Amino acid sequence: MGRKSNESCSANPHSSSISQENLSQWNLDAEDLFDENESFLSEKDGVAGGKTNKNHLESPAEQLVLQLTVSEHAHSRSQNNNQGVFQLWSSPVNKGSIIDKRNSSVEENVTDESDLSESEKMNDSLLSYFKKMDLNLKPETIEHVERAFTEEANQVSVYADFLPAPFNTMDLHRFAFSKCESWKTTVDPPESSIERLIMRLLELERLQHMTIQRERPKLQSTFCSSMFSMAERPSSSKAITLKARPPKIPETPTLQTSSVDKNRDKRKNNSGSGKPEQNVPKWSLSTAGKSKSNSRSLLKCSSTSKQCAMAHDDVKNPKNSILNPCQDPPPKPTTTTQAIQPMIKVVSTRCLPPRSPMPVSPIPLSFPENPREEVKVPRTKKKCHRKSILQNRPFHVQKRNCLSPSLIARGKCSPTDQK
């Protein structure tokens, strides 16, 4: 019995050593992937171990059977280990392919969800479509074929078929330069209606040729004139601007019209007042502050009394007219006072200072051709006023003192005082 137990014990450690070696290799190669196989095998080992423990004291034949079964299990374990190793080496390759597939699907989703417009998508699709196509675009070869025209070959102009046989081959252009009846010599005279038609065609051909010859020089002349006009545009524009400028109008007529309007307004105001001072001259009123007594006497006397006194003084003393520096040589004295009164008025209007820079007489508004003539008029009339200023006493004061009736009655004014 002791021997059998020893043998069984020696057999059991051998089987256990084999199982431990196989399990150690399995655990080192595939610990994570084949847990289920290990659990299954461990259960079998546990069952087998239980059986060996139960049959520890049984016959040796049964022990041999158990050893054989354990060896078979070990062989199956080694085969399973080899398969697991191959699976471990092949598994990363499969995982990489799976990862690549997943990345490609993610990229496709990203590109689809990106902000691409419809036009860009269409362009991409078109580009992908054209890349697949094989387009061999080449220009077509054109063959230059020289066709011989019938006119050049036969040197006869072909016209429509509505003409009869001899006339459809006639050269109307050649017959147009010759006389209209020259074609009758070449061709038998046909019917009257066809003759009129051919005559009309020849006339039209001739007119067309004449118009072309007439229009050719016109076209050349117009082309040359257009070229010259383009070259001479700046100079012609200057000439046009000079012509467009109107001549300068002298400014003197505007001054004259303004002075005339002012004098008319003053006359209207004086006529509306209705006072006896309306006939008193302006220069007599301007110097009223110098001598009050003389101005009062002038305001009281009327225009008729002044004229009579002036006429009486001129009849008695014809030298009074000589005292005027601007007066013309004295005319011969007459006995009638009617002839003397207008002369006194003319002298007073000429030599006294003018009321306005221009005469009061109405002036026509027509502009003169020579503006220098207008300038001469005020110069001649300014001389009288200048000469009167050169004297010690102005002339209008002398005349006012001498013509007043109160001073004449008192005898204060005399020719010696005036000198």
Swiss-Prot record:
Q: Which cysteines are joined by disulfide bonds?
A: none
Superkingdom of the organism of origin: Eukaryota
Compositional bias annotation for Basic residues: 378-388
Q: Which residues form a coiled coil?
A: none
From the UniProt entry, list the residue stretches annotated as the region Disordered: 1-23, 100-119, 234-298, 362-388
Where does this protein have compositionally biased stretches of type Polar residues?
Answer: 7-23, 284-298
Family note: Belongs to the FAM217 family.
| Name of the protein this chain belongs to | Protein FAM217A
* Organism (species): Rattus norvegicus (Rat)
- What lineage, starting at the top, does this entry show? Eukaryota, Metazoa, Chordata, Craniata, Vertebrata
User: What gene does the UniProt entry assign to this protein?
Assistant: Fam217a
